[in-house]
Amino acid sequence: MTTHQTDHDGASSEGTVTVTEAGSGTYTQQINAGHHRIVADEPRPIGDDAGPTPYDLLLAALGACTSMTVRMYADRKGWPLRRVRVTLRHSRIHARDCADCETSVGFVDQIDRDIELTGDLDDTQRERLLYMADRCPVHQTLTSEVHITTSLR
């Protein structure tokens, strides 16, 4: 069993995220990622709305990774990309309403991602950046087989 250490001030080691009940509010969580601290919560009336929900954080991970990947590619190519904005929405839809889904019964999670590119880009550059958006590591993780192991201490 692998254990991950936190340093004396509660910060997680590189590549490890630690989530702990904050002690304030019913569902409020303190998230430590390296030396960064984030609060997560559920919206009212379930929680105290002290921070983004877990699904908000999932969308934020995909949006940030998408924007960073597009930016890195455009910079490497020397393309005139001034700004990237990614807007994401999560919903659960009936599987029968999803033409591209393998699942045919029950519900599936759907993420709608809208990418706005600002800059003097031609159509070929825009299409290539759209292609690269799907190559961001978080997108690759979410669309591939994921194996999660859980241990209890």
Report residues per predicted region.
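Extended beta-strand/beta-hairpin segments
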Residues: M1-A60, R71-R153
